[in-house]
């Protein structure tokens, strides 16, 4: 099931967006080791500027442009799970020995139905270890619109939003319960409701007792 998409231009657009959870991404950083960050969207200047302060390998892979997200596939197009995993793996095109510390998923999960999301998570698995954490954005329910934005991270508690430059792809709702089931090895350890109905998620492997899986709404 899809839900209503937001208009491409918003009368109340505000570029800066406060985050209560983005700072958690940096709590496990070890200053003597290189940080590997995967950003699923296009390279945004705020993200580049922030991570320039770290010993960091910053990888931008804009998966929003994948044909799989267009919703225009033929009705008889039914790839297997493994074929979808292989397509995502090819799109990621990561070196075999890559281990990611931080995944910036932004609102990418909202553009994948359950089948695609499972395949994407499986394709990412070889590059994940016990310390990997992630950040994502969603909507609380189908009555909330998902704005057509792109994102960067400006500082530890502030994101920067950019108006989307292309027509918004089809959007699919995922409740927090469904999302937890679809994310496999990732757990939603913390979630916060934003004033406009969006939700931010902090994801981890669930191996660290200091992160408690307790939604606040």
Show which residues each predicted segment covers.
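A short glycine-rich, Lys/Arg-flanked "PGG" loop and its adjoining helix->strand segment in the class I
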Residues: 118-133
